[in-house]
């Protein structure tokens, strides 16, 4: 009986990336080639048989889209001791009769890891390692920032302290946090040369392979990844302005401590890098005074002078408590002041805007406190979170009534409450005279002897399933003259559009704009018909007809045409090559694109009547309506008002009958 595994992915693309990583790792360690074959399953949870020439065989089943199944993965992680209910891009389990056994978690970052987005994912690493699940973070380096004309401006990089945090975490949780840095597909030759010593080799593949071959994971497997991660941080630090960050000598001390799992607060406190954080949003008059107070105390910067956190030596906390009492008066509790005075630990202060002008959560900020905890994973420090953004008044009421209840229903507050020792509020929306501090009492970690129940194959149907059907049908179809240029299901990162030119080379446009003027709308899918009839088909997918935008079809056409015709491609891969370069023959590419018609389609969950209405409502050239039945079968309805496109798609779908049968998809085209 073949062993069965499941990949619970953020979407179907992440599931496919995970299966590629797993099979590549096993091939590397065994030297055995393999095949991956779609087997009889259903469209919402497609299954694949993986067969290696050495006799190893197993089945991998995809479960795309988190938090829509009969079992809650975040709740399970909480029971295992995770302070956060954060999911990852791909969570791999071993399927038993009634349960699933967690094996590994994969995170894929191929968007530009800079600015506040660089720490958005920090909570995921903390969530997995706290639950004792091996976590592998794959990050592409050297992605290009584009100017307003979509020409390459410069590569973007994170603050060195962000990748440093993963290195620190890897020492605090041996064998549980591994970072793999790889060159971006749009990396320049110069940038590649700068960072080539930091790019991963194949050692980490031994650790991934061991999860599926029954071997022990040796620390030796991951040792080199730690060395590479350290090199990447050092290379980043070397590129930064000297006045903005620590000296290279200090960075080397920090890296040595992180690799050995030793505390690092002492290095930061003795480095004398002054913290100079600036607040960019409208704030209370007291907030600049708080920042000025911290500067007078000569608190130490972490990573660079402008990061939103600093560290304070324990010897300065009594003075800090005294000055905070003067600044905030009776709105600061005696309990908070006494705690601050009497604690014998160094203090990390994290500044969190947390909220947009209208009071909605700012998603990237949920990673700030996890990032601080990861940096100091080998230190025993206290953390105060200063929340200064314009949260709604009801939020403050809930925070002071029951912070744990608030955290149970909100990811931002979950990170703040569960990973801070205290919270200080200095926001314009806090009622005058309201107490502004919360002390977080230590909660016993809920490490339970629990198992993950087997997931049902039938989810709460939605846009994920529409996107999965389109992707399963159109992907891997080059032999039939069809190329999937873009698939961006929910949770996707819009990392790029690919296009096959007349020479068979793949040209890629990255860092996609959300719109191209008021006339353009970024599609969810782009399909290239490159055979006799040359068409670029842009598709908008939605769950329901009512959520479909009026007149979106022409806007899809405009976006894709504007991008491919007038926008510069950033990278190119020759036919049958694995290497990407920036050497693009613009003349060949422009000529190839000019030969195509640009058409549009929409895809929704629905019946024949809704298919017809979606075609009219969207003003597009074709529509797909998809019905999901409780028994797992799928009905796919296709309609088009464009004779050429209708014939092309029907002919193509007829070549996919075997695939449709395996996925239990019933096709019906209507006039």
Language model: regions and residue ranges:
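Non-catalytic C-terminal interaction segments of nucleic acid-processing enzymes
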Residues: 112, 161-458, 516-517, 582-671
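Low-complexity, serine/threonine/proline-enriched polar segments
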Residues: 3, 24-70, 162-204
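Catalytic cores of nucleic-acid endonucleases
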Residues: 111-160, 374-375, 383-388, 520-523, ...
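Compact beta-rich and alpha/beta scaffold cores in large eukaryotic transport/transcription complexes
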Residues: 9-13, 21-47, 138-144, 196, ...
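Phosphate/oxyanion-binding active-site loops and adjacent basic polyanion-contact surfaces
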Residues: 14-15, 81-87, 113-118, 458-467, ...
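Active-site metal-binding core of divalent-cation-utilizing nuclease and nuclease-like domains
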Residues: 36-98, 304-332, 353-357, 480-534
């Amino acid at each position: 009986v073949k062993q069965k595994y499941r990949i619970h992915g953020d979407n179907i693309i992440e599931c496919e990336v995970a299966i590629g990583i797993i099979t590549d790792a096993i091939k590397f360690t065994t030297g055995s080639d393999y095949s991956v074959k779609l087997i009889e399953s259903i469209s919402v949870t497609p299954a694949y048989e993986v067969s290696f020439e050495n006799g190893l065989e197993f089945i991998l089943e995809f479960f795309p889209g988190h938090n829509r199944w009969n079992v809650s993965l975040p709740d399970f992680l909480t029971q295992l001791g995770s302070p956060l209910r954060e999911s990852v891009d791909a969570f791999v389990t071993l399927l038993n009769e009634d349960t699933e056994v967690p094996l590994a978690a994969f995170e894929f970052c191929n968007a530009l890891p800079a600015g506040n987005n660089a720490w958005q994912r920090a909570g995921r690493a903390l969530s997995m390692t706290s639950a004792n699940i091996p976590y592998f973070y794959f990050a592409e380096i050297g992605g290009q920032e584009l100017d307003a004309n979509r020409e390459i401006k410069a590569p973007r990089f994170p603050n060195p302290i962000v990748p440093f945090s993963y290195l620190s975490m890897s020492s605090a949780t041996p064998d549980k946090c591994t970072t793999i840095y790889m060159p971006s597909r749009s990396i320049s030759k110069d940038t590649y040369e700068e960072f080539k010593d930091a790019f991963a080799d194949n050692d980490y593949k031994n650790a991934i392979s061991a999860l599926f071959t029954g071997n022990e994971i040796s620390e030796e497997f991951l040792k080199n990844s730690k060395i590479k991660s350290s090199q990447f941080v050092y290379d980043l630090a070397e590129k930064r302005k000297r006045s903005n960050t620590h000296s290279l000598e200090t960075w080397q001390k920090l890296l040595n401590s992180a690799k050995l799992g030793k505390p690092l607060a002492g290095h930061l406190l003795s480095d004398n890098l002054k913290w100079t954080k600036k607040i960019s949003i409208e704030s209370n008059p007291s907030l600049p005074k708080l920042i000025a107070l911290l500067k007078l105390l000569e608190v130490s910067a972490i990573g660079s002078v402008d990061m939103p956190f600093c560290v304070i030596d324990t010897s300065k906390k009594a003075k800090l408590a005294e000055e905070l009492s003067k600044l905030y008066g009776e709105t600061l509790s005696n309990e908070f002041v006494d705690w601050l005075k009497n604690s014998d630990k160094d203090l990390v202060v994290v500044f969190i805007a947390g909220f947009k002008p209208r009071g909605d959560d700012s998603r990237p900020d949920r990673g700030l406190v996890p990032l601080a905890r990861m940096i100091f994973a080998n230190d025993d420090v206290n953390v105060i979170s200063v929340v200064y953004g314009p949260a709604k008044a009801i939020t403050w009421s809930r925070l002071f009534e029951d912070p744990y209840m608030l955290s149970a229903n909100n990811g931002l507050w979950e990170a703040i409450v569960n990973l801070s020792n205290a919270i200080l509020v200095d926001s314009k929306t806090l009622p005058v005279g309201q107490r502004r501090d919360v002390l977080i009492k230590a909660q016993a970690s809920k490490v339970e002897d629990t198992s993950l129940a087997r997931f049902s194959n039938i989810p709460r149907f939605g846009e994920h399933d529409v996107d999965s059907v389109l992707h399963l049908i159109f992907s891997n179809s080059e032999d039939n003259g069809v190329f999937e240029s873009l698939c961006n299901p929910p949770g996707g990162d819009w990392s790029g559009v690919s296009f096959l030119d007349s020479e068979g080379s793949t040209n890629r446009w990255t860092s996609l704009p959300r719109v191209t003027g008021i006339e353009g709308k970024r599609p969810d899918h782009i399909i290239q018909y490159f055979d006799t009839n040359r068409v670029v088909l842009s598709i908008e997918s939605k769950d329901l007809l009512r959520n479909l935008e009026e007149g979106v079809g022409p806007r899809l056409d405009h976006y894709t045409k504007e991008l491919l015709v007038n926008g510069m491609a950033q990278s190119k891969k020759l036919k049958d090559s694995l290497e990407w370069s920036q050497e693009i023959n613009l003349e060949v590419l422009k000529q190839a694109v000019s030969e195509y018609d640009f058409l549009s389609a929409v895809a929704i969950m629905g019946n024949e009547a809704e298919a017809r209405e979606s075609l009219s409502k969207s003003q597009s050239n074709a529509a797909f309506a998809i019905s999901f039945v409780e028994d797992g079968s799928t009905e796919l309805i296709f309609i088009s008002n464009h004779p050429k496109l209708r014939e092309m798609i029907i002919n193509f779908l007829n070549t996919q009958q075997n695939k449709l049968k395996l996925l239990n998809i019933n096709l019906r085209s209507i006039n």
